[in-house]
Amino acid sequence: MTTTDRIAAAFARVSEAGRAAALIPYIAAGDPSPQATVPLMHALVRAGADLVELGVPFSDPMADGPVVQRAAERAIAQGVGLRRVLELVADFRRDDSVTPVVLMGYANPIERMGQRAFAQAAQAAGVDGVLVVDYPPEEVDEFAAMLAEAGVAPIFLLAPTSTEARIEAIGRVARGYVYYVSLKGVTGAGSLDTDDVARKLALIRRHVHIPVGVGFGIRDAASAQRIAAHADAVVIGSKLIETMEQAGAQAGADQKNEAAIAAAQQWLHTIRLALDDVKRENAPA
């Protein structure tokens, strides 16, 4: 199965099961440690993740709130950069050839590696999609083409401030799914206005004909359910990382990885159970 096929297949499985939305957890590669990342990814899949977003640590993460920033800092302190992230994806692929993995990060590490070299390395590692926070869609046609040539989906962010023209532009180049940022500001901030999200998704779907995931501000089962009633995927990052952070802080020095992984799996499973109660419209009973 090729990389872009894995994303489509994941959303197809969700639909065939009658579920309203896919569950996409976000973690920072290398947090709580490089050794924990691959076991953590497998634990998230066991908990019910349909796709996994893997953050590439960067020293100036302008779109990330304090929780995700701390995770990136911990990873960088342990020597995790883009090349190590690709190695971790390849390690994950040895035991899981089904679950899509999407890298989320910033342009600088990709530019240092070279766009074409990165696209080829991502494909070789088993990456399914790439979301670069600070690449505007009107400037990335060449990079998107390189990714597509390598079978990797270029994924883009949309925000409450996105104009219809920008939505239309992204609809032309995005593959896999698009990620709607439900709040203004950084990750982990604010509270959700579900009605506003629903209105914006209706506008997005006029121009975007692939699944639309929603993230930012989803912190518990109730908010996940509200978003799942409207979105094709629910993306959860800050609260998941915070849950691991707290579990690790309470564990002994030699048990921090295990405690963080167990807490993540348990917490994400509660979200998956909540999402399973939200059924897709016209789904079989």
UniProtKB/Swiss-Prot annotation:
| InterPro entries in UniProt | Aldolase_TIM, RibuloseP-bd_barrel, Trp_synthase_alpha_AS, Trp_synthase_suA
Q: Which residues constitute the catalytic centre?
A: 53, 64
**Keywords associated with the record:** Amino-acid biosynthesis, Aromatic amino acid biosynthesis, Lyase, Tryptophan biosynthesis
Q: Does the keyword Cell inner membrane apply?
A: no
Q: Does the keyword Amino-acid biosynthesis apply?
A: yes
Q: Name one GO molecular function term.
A: tryptophan synthase activity
GO cellular component labels: cytosol
Per the record, the pathway is:
Amino-acid biosynthesis; L-tryptophan biosynthesis; L-tryptophan from chorismate: step 5/5
CDD domains in alphabetical order: Tryptophan_synthase_alpha
Q: Which domain of life is it from?
A: Bacteria
Q: EC number(s) for this protein?
A: 4.2.1.20
Q: What reaction(s) does this enzyme catalyze?
A: (1S,2R)-1-C-(indol-3-yl)glycerol 3-phosphate + L-serine = D-glyceraldehyde 3-phosphate + L-tryptophan + H2O
SUPFAM superfamilies, alphabetically?
A: Ribulose-phoshate binding barrel (SSF51366)
Q: How does it assemble?
A: Tetramer of two alpha and two beta chains.
NCBIfam families attached to this UniProt entry:
trpA
What role is this protein assigned? Answer: The alpha subunit is responsible for the aldol cleavage of indoleglycerol phosphate to indole and glyceraldehyde 3-phosphate.
Q: Which family does it belong to?
A: Belongs to the TrpA family.
Indicate what this protein is called per its UniProt record.
Answer: Tryptophan synthase alpha chain
